[in-house]
Amino acid sequence: MKAFSPVRSIRKNSLLDHRLGISQSKTPVDDLMSLL
């Protein structure tokens, strides 16, 4: 379980950053490319 906790935190942070990026950016394509 200890190995999964950091991964979950990283995923949560990435999701939050992605949402902020969408709200600030007018081009969702750039946000999708940043995730890839």
UniProtKB/Swiss-Prot annotation:
<protein>
    <recommendedName>
        <fullName>Putative DNA-binding protein inhibitor ID-2B</fullName>
    </recommendedName>
</protein>
